[in-house]
Amino acid sequence: MAMVVSSWRDPQDDVAGGNPGGPNPAAQAARGGGGGAGEQQQAGSGAPHTPQTPGQPGAPATPGTQGDKGQGPPGSGQSQQHIECVVCGDKSSGKHYGQFTCEGCKSFFKRSVRRNLTYTCRANRNCPIDQHHRNQCQYCRLKKCLKVGMRREAVQRGRMPPTQPNPGQYALTNGDPLNGHCYLSGYISLLLRAEPYPTSRYGSQCMQPNNIMGIENICELAARLLFSAVEWARNIPFFPDLQITDQVSLLRLTWSELFVLNAAQCSMPLHVAPLLAAAGLHASPMSADRVVAFMDHIRIFQEQVEKLKALHVDSAEYSCLKAIVLFTSDACGLSDAAHIESLQEKSQCALEEYVRSQYPNQPSRFGKLLLRLPSLRTVSSSVIEQLFFVRLVGKTPIETLIRDMLLSGSSFNWPYMSIQCS
C-alpha cells in the first residue's frame, strides 16, 4: 500500500502516455507518445528534441530500436494513435476516469468502485499487471488503477470535467508543476469534493426564530454531522484503499474529534438548556451533581468550537485538519501503522503549503491550527453520545453504528437514518 501513496499525483498532472511513477523533466522532453507503467520512453528518430546528454534518463532511442517506430512529434495525431493503457499496457480506447485506459481496465475500475468491492491479494500485494496478468489479481489491479490516478469520484458522480480548482480557494501556487504544489492542490480539492453535503448550512437550517435550536432538531443535526464524517472519509483519497478493519479502527477512534470539527465548521448552536434537556429526557431525572458535570462537559465542547471559530478556519483547512485527525497511527490493530502515519504527514504538508500560500501575512497560522487538534480529545466521546445520540439510537454504541455504516457501503442506506427526532 505504500506504493500507492508515494506515487499518487493530481490527475491534472498526467498527460497522454505519462509515466505513472512520477514526472521526469528529461523524459517529458524526449517522449513523443504513450507508455504504460514500466515501459521505456519512445522518441521519433530524426525528430527535433531538446538537447540531452548521452545516457541521460529519457534520452531518444537510437535508430533501429523500438523507439523510432511510428512516432511523430508530441501532440501529433500519429502519436496519439499509439497511446497505451496506463494500467496494463493494452491499447487505450480513450480517457476514462482521468486516465488513458483500455476498455477492460475501465470496466473493471467502474465495477469495483460502484459495487464498493474489496479484494484480497494471495501473494505480496505487488503482482505484475499487464495484458497477460491483469485478470490474475484484482487487488493489485485496482491498486494500480488508483496508483496511476484513476478517480473514484468520477465513477460515483458520472462524467466530470478535468479538475480545475478555483485559484482563490484551492490553488497553492502558480509555479512549476513538478515542485509538488499541483499534487497538494489536487489533494485538497479531492478532500473538499468528498463532502457529501454542505456542512456550513446545517446550523442555520435547524435554528428557530429565537436563534435557539430546539430539542427536536438537535439529534437530527448531530446525526447529519456524524453521517457527514463517515461519508467524507469513505470518499477521500487513500482511505477507501485501506483494509476495512483499518477503516473501522480509524473512525471508531476519531469520530468524536471529527464530530467537533464538523460542529465548529457548521457553527452548531450549543446552548446549555436544550442540550441538558436532550440528555435528560431519555433517562431518569438527573441529580444536581450530574447536571453540574454535564454543564462542565458542554462548556468544554463550547470552548473547542469557539476557539476554532475564532481562527476563521476555511473549508480547505477544515478538510486538511479532518484528514490529519483521521489518519492517526494511534488506532489499535492497524495492519500498517507506518502507512497510516505517512498519510497523516501528507495531509499535514498539504495544510502547511496551503496556509503559507493563502495566508502569507499570518506566519503563525499553521501552528495555531495544529495546536487545536490535541485539545479536541478533551471533549468526551461518551458525553457526545449522551448529549446527541441516545434519543436516536438508544444504548447502541456509536462505534457499532460506524462499523455498520462502513460495511453497508453508505450511511444514507443506514437504517437509523430514517428515524425522525420527536
From Swiss-Prot:
Residues 183-409 form the NR LBD domain. It comes from the Eukaryota. Residues 343-422 are annotated as: Important for dimerization. SUPFAM superfamilies: Glucocorticoid receptor-like (DNA-binding domain) (SSF57716), Nuclear receptor ligand-binding domain (SSF48508). It is found in: Nucleus. Binds DNA as dimer; homodimer and probable heterodimer with NR2F6. Interacts with GTF2B; this interaction is direct. Interacts with COPS2. GO terms for biological process: cerebral cortex regionalization; forebrain development; interneuron migration; negative regulation of transcription by RNA polymerase II; neuron migration; positive regulation of miRNA transcription; regulation of gene expression. The lineage of its organism: Eukaryota, Metazoa, Chordata, Craniata, Vertebrata. It comes from Mus musculus. Coup (chicken ovalbumin upstream promoter) transcription factor binds to the ovalbumin promoter and, in conjunction with another protein (S300-II) stimulates initiation of transcription. Binds to both direct repeats and palindromes of the 5'-AGGTCA-3' motif. Represses transcriptional activity of LHCG. Residues 39-66 have a biased composition (Low complexity). This is COUP transcription factor 1. A zinc finger (NR C4-type) spans 85-105, 121-145.
